[in-house]
Design a protein with these regions (language model features):
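Cytosolic catalytic domains that perform sulfur/thiol-centered chemistry
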Residues: 1-277
C-alpha cells in the first residue's frame, strides 16, 4: 500500500508497524528512549533508530525538572512548544512515538500531545515493531510552528485534590513499590497514596512488549474496580509511566482518565501525607 496514505483526522492511542509504514511520509516519528538508571537515551538513538526518527530528550522537553512538584513535573508550555518546534512537530503534525520499553516511557510524549488535542500515538511494541532496518544517520528536521498552550486542567489532578477525589486512583508502579516492600532512593516514603489500587503499567504488555488483547487489559482494570464510566486518576513515581495506563484505558474503551503529574515523588515528599502500605 502507498506509504503516503492519508492520515485520518483522529488516530488511536496505539498503532502498529504496518500502520506506520502506510503513513510514514505524513508522520513525525519520535524516538523517546529514556532510562531511569541514567543511561543515555541519545546514545541508544545514535546506535540505531527508525529511519527519519527525531530524538526527543525527555529531560529537556518533557519534564520541568525535579523540584517541589516532583521529579518530572510537566514542563512550562513554552518550553514544550520550543522543543516540539525544533523537532519539526507543528500544530497540525501527526506524531508516532516509540521507545524500547514497551511504550511506558514514550507514553509521556503521546499523552502530552493528545491532551493538547494533537494527533499522536504509541508504536505498539516499540522499536522492535519496526519491520525494516534501523538507521544511524542524524536527522535534522526543518523547524515547525507549534503553539504553546496551557496544560488542560480538565486532564489533570493535583496533590491537594486527591483527598476529596471520589473516583479510583490507580498506581502504575510495580507491585513491590506499591506495597512498600521496595523503596527506591528516589522514593521519599515507601508505599502508596491511601486508597489507591495497583495496575502496574508493564502488565499491559505481553512477553515481547506489545499491548495485550483488549479483553485482557480490561480485565486487569476490572479487577481493581475500573469499569465503563469509572472516573480514574493515574499516577506513578513521577508522572511518566502513569501515562501508559491512561493510553491503555482509552485504547480499551474505558475512557480518558486524569493524570496526577507529580506522582509519588511529589505526594510522599510532604511529611504530613502518610503512606499506605
Amino acid at each position: 500500500m502507498d506509504a503516503t496514505q492519508a492520515i485520518p483526522d483522529s488516530i488511536p492511542p496505539f498503532v502498529d508497524g504496518a500502520w506506520l509504514q502506510r503513513h510514514r511520509d505524513g508522520v513525525v516519528v519520535a524516538d523517546a528512549r529514556w532510562y531511569l538508571d541514567g543511561s543515555s537515551g541519545r546514545g541508544a538513538y545514535d546506535r540505531g533508530h527508525i529511519p527519519c526518527a527525531v530524538f526527543v530528550d525527555l529531560d529537556a522537553w518533557l519534564s520541568g525538572g525535579a523540584g517541589a512538584k516532583g521529579l518530572n513535573p510537566l514542563p512550562d508550555p513554552a518550553v514544550f512548544a520550543r522543543g516540539m518546534s525544533s523537532l519539526g512537530v507543528g500544530d497540525d503534525s501527526t506524531v508516532v512515538a516509540y521507545d524500547d520499553a514497551g511504550g511506558v516511557i514514550a507514553a509521556r510524549l503521546v499523552w502530552m500531545l493528545r491532551a493538547l488535542g494533537k494527533r499522536a500515538a504509541l508504536l505498539d511494541g516499540g522499536i522492535a515493531a519496526w519491520p525494516g532496518l534501523l538507521d544511524r544517520d542524524p536527522v535534522h528536521p526543518a523547524p515547525a510552528s507549534f503553539t504553546a498552550a496551557p496544560w488542560p486542567e480538565e486532564s489533570l489532578v493535583q496533590a491537594d485534590d486527591l483527598e476529596a477525589w471520589a473516583g479510583i486512583v490507580v498506581d502504575a508502579r510495580h507491585a513491590d513499590r506499591f506495597d512498600g516492600s521496595l523503596q527506591l532512593p528516589t522514593d521519599p516514603q515507601a508505599g502508596h497514596i491511601p486508597g489507591a489500587v495497583n495496575v502496574p503499567c508493564r502488565e499491559n504488555l505481553d512477553s515481547v512488549g506489545r499491548l495485550r488483547p483488549i479483553a485482557e487489559v480490561r480485565e486487569a482494570f476490572a479487577r481493581v474496580g475500573v469499569r465503563d464510566g469509572s472516573a480514574v486518576v493515574s499516577y506513578c513515581g513521577s508522572g511518566i509511566t502513569a501515562c501508559h495506563n491512561l493510553l491503555a484505558l482509552e485504547h480499551v474503551g474505558l475512557g480518558r482518565g486524569l493524570l496526577y503529574p507529580g506522582g509519588w515523588s511529589e505526594y510522599a515528599e510532604d511529611p504530613r501525607r502518610i503512606a499506605e502500605r
